[in-house]
C-alpha cells in the first residue's frame, strides 16, 4: 500500500506505470488506424528492456496488455487519452499559450513529437529518478525537443510551485497545464494542494486539462484490492489497486468553475465513441476503468488567486478579479 512519503524510480511502484502506458502507446502506434502516434514510446520501452521490450516483440503472448478484454480496451484507452490531451494542447497553443506545464511528465514525449509555436517553453515535472532515466534515454538516442524543454525534478507532494518558478516559469504570463494519469496516485489532500497550486500560478487566459476518476465504494475497492493480491500470488504482476488512492478532493469541473474557470467534462466512454473505439460491455474486466474516468479541460476567464502571483509559497486561497486596462 502507498504511504505519503513513499518513493520510486521508473521501474518501481507508481513510476513503473510510465512504462506500462508507454507500452500501450507503442502498441496503439502499431495499429493501422492509430488514435495517436508516439514513436518515442517504443524507444523508452526498449531502453528499459525486460517485459516491455518483449511485449512489443510479441514474445509474451499471454501478457495482459495483449490478451483478453483488458488489454484491448486499455490500449484503446491510452490511445484515446493521448489524442485528447494532444488536441487540448493544439487548442491551447492556438490561443497563444507559450508556457506548457506537464505535471508528473513521466515518459510523456509531447515536447518531441508535437509541433509547438516558436518561443514555447515546456516544463516537465517529475521525480528526479524518473527524469534521470528519461533524459539519459533521450541523450543516448540523440532525440531533441521541438521547443525549449526544462526538466523540473520535484515530488508533486512537495513545494513544486517554487521549483517550477525557480526554473523560469512566469506566473504573470498565461500557461497551459495537464495532469494526465496523475490524480489517482495522489491522496485527496495532495490533489487539493495540486489544484490550488495550478490556480495560484495560472494567469487569466490560461488553460488546464486533467484526467480524474470517480472513487469506488470503499467496500468494492477493498474487494478489488483483495482479489488483486490473490492474483499476484498466482503470478499476475498487476498492482493497480495497491498503488492508487481511492479518493477525490473535488470534481474538477466544479472546483475550477467556482474559481473563475470555464470547464468542460468529457467522459472517457463518450470520447471513445467519438473517435470510433469500442466501449467495453458492462460485465467485462475493463468496464469499471472506462466508466470511472473523465477528461476535464478548462480556460481561466477572470478570477485569480490572491496574494501576488509571484509568491507561489503562499497558502492563501482568496481571490480578486482582474480588471481590464
Swiss-Prot record:
The organism's place on the tree of life at top rank: Bacteria
Any Pfam family matching the protein: LCM
Keyword Transferase belongs to the record: yes
EC number: 2.1.1.-
Binding site for S-adenosyl-L-methionine: 126, 155-156
Single GO MF annotation: methyltransferase activity
Signal peptide feature range: none
Keywords: Methyltransferase, S-adenosyl-L-methionine, Transferase
Keyword Cytoplasm: no
One GO biological process term: methylation
Function according to Swiss-Prot or TrEMBL: Exhibits S-adenosyl-L-methionine-dependent methyltransferase activity.
Entry's family note: Belongs to the UPF0677 family.
Name of protein: Putative S-adenosyl-L-methionine-dependent methyltransferase MRA_0901
Natural source organism: Mycobacterium tuberculosis (strain ATCC 25177 / H37Ra)
Amino acid at each position: 500500500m502507498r504511504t505519503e512519503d513513499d518513493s520510486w524510480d521508473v521501474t518501481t511502484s507508481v513510476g513503473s506505470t510510465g512504462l506500462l502506458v508507454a507500452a500501450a502507446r507503442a502498441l496503439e502506434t502499431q495499429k493501422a488506424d492509430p488514435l495517436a502516434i508516439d514513436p518515442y514510446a517504443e524507444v523508452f520501452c526498449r531502453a528499459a528492456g525486460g517485459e516491455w521490450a518483449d511485449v512489443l516483440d510479441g514474445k509474451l503472448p499471454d501478457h495482459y496488455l495483449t490478451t483478453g478484454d483488458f488489454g484491448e480496451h486499455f490500449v484503446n484507452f491510452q490511445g484515446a487519452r493521448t489524442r485528447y490531451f494532444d488536441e487540448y494542447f493544439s487548442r491551447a497553443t492556438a490561443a497563444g499559450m507559450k508556457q506548457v506545464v506537464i505535471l508528473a511528465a513521466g515518459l510523456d514525449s509531447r515536447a518531441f513529437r508535437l509541433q509547438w509555436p516558436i518561443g514555447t517553453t515546456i516544463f516537465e515535472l517529475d521525480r528526479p529518478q524518473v527524469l534521470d532515466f528519461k533524459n539519459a534515454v533521450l541523450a543516448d538516442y540523440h532525440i531533441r525537443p521541438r521547443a525549449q524543454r526544462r526538466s523540473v525534478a520535484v515530488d508533486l507532494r512537495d513545494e513544486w510551485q517554487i521549483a517550477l518558478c525557480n526554473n523560469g516559469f512566469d506566473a504573470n504570463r498565461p500557461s497551459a497545464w495537464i495532469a494526465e494519469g496523475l490524480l489517482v496516485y495522489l491522496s485527496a489532500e495532495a490533489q487539493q494542494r495540486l489544484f490550488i497550486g495550478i490556480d495560484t500560478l495560472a494567469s487569466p487566459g490560461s488553460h488546464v486539462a486533467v484526467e480524474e476518476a470517480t472513487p469506488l465504494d470503499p467496500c468494492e475497492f477493498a474487494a478489488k484490492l483483495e482479489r488483486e493480491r490473490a492474483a499476484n500470488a498466482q503470478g499476475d504482476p498487476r498492482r493497480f489497486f495497491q498503488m492508487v488512492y481511492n479518493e477525490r478532493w473535488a470534481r474538477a469541473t466544479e472546483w475550477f468553475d467556482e474559481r473563475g474557470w470555464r470547464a468542460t467534462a468529457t467522459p472517457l466512454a463518450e470520447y471513445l465513441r467519438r473517435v470510433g473505439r469500442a466501449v467495453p460491455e458492462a460485465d467485462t474486466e475493463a468496464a469499471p476503468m472506462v466508466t470511472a474516468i473523465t477528461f476535464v479541460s478548462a480556460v481561466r476567464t477572470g478570477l485569480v488567486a490572491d496574494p501576488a502571483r509571484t509568491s507561489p509559497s503562499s497558502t492563501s486561497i482568496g481571490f480578486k478579479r482582474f480588471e481590464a486596462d
